[in-house]
Amino acid sequence: MVFTDLIFLFCFLPISVLLTKQIRNIKLQNILLVVFSLLFYAWSNPIYVVLLILSILWNYFTAFELEAQDDKKTKRILLIVSVAVNLFILGFYKYTGFLMDILHIQSNLKIALPVGLSFFTFSELSYIFDVYNGKSKPQKNIILFTLYVSFFGKISMGPIVSYHEMEDQLTNRTLSKAQYASGMVLFSKGLIKKVLLADQLSYVYSILQNNTSTLGVWLLAISYMLQIYFDFSGYSDMAIGLSRFFGFDFKPNFDHPYTATSVQDFWRKWHISLSQWFRDYLYIPLGGNRIDKNTYIRNIFIVWFCTGLWHGANWTFILWGLYYGCLLLLEKFYLREKLEKLPKPISHIYTLLVVLIGWVFFMSPNITTAFSTLGKMIGIGATTFANNQAKFMLKSYFILFVLAILLSTKVYDRIQIFVYNQYKMKAVYTTWTIYIILIIVCIAFIVGGTYHSFLYFAF
């Protein structure tokens, strides 16, 4: 089940919200949310609920053992074992096929990736690390810990919420009209982003995948660049929005990343929860930036190798991660001062270009295809500059491209603020009217079967 399924939109979500609203006791609310979350997770493949529960139990009991240990060496060994078990589960389901390919092992073994495994594993690891470092006490209530890991608002594709950020909200949260209203706005924005922008860009991308002209390849890369933003930020908006229906308040996962003026700035704005996870639980424990230059360089490559590998079992993802590691090192040691002196439009264009190149690695099925695509973008290997298909797609979807580019910036937010300041309540009524119309259009697309699964659903 995903957020754009009709059964979720018209049955699962309304029923869970209405039932939770009727219950005043937060303990009973939590039990109900656990039931709904496990049902949500079981919908696509019930057998993996067993894996989820076993994973929860392992980390639940391990945390008590960690706190009980006074001997630092024993405690550290227990931490290593706990992390190893979590990573083994993740690795078995996500990387076995990749490893077998590397070792040239022939097998018909097909291992399906459990939904949200990468996300809930990182949530559990954050809990173990928080307990180990003394940021949090072990959660004695198994219901609360299960809710933290399995809450259906974030288990599929995040955001990755650290335990210490959600701990108080598990037992101390309120449901208000303001939360419902802001949650509805955010959920609606996410649905519109996904169905009316990401899915339409997905169609453009699918049509252009075999195009061999320079213009066609540029349109291919740009359509993917915009699609993945609206797809994933749309999901994140829906997740954060619906979480507010139940009193949870999660931090934004995106902050207009395509307005960034450096690669470092881009990663402050893109998939923020993942960036913060790697910063808090890998980069800083490795020494952060308070170390010598060679160790710093090593740590950057470790972090970005892991970031790439987390995204998928393919050399293209690893190369994508290392590519960003190299760019961040270049900016830190050579380009930072130069970028700061450049006019913002120039540094913005630089950032968009290097990010676009990164998405070419990310979207390609293999490294050969990635470099072939990059070659065609500068005319190497392209059959022509612009063939008929590329011209037709540009002409037919020009408005979509322009609209998507504008909406990926802060233009809409600024217009909304200006209009509200000028017209107050009239602006609110008009905005809601537009939202309702667009939501009806979204539902029509979904009913017609012209929507696609979320891209990050595969990660």
Model-derived segments and their meaning:
Residues M1-S408, Q416-A458:
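Membrane-embedded transmembrane alpha-helical bundles that form the catalytic cores
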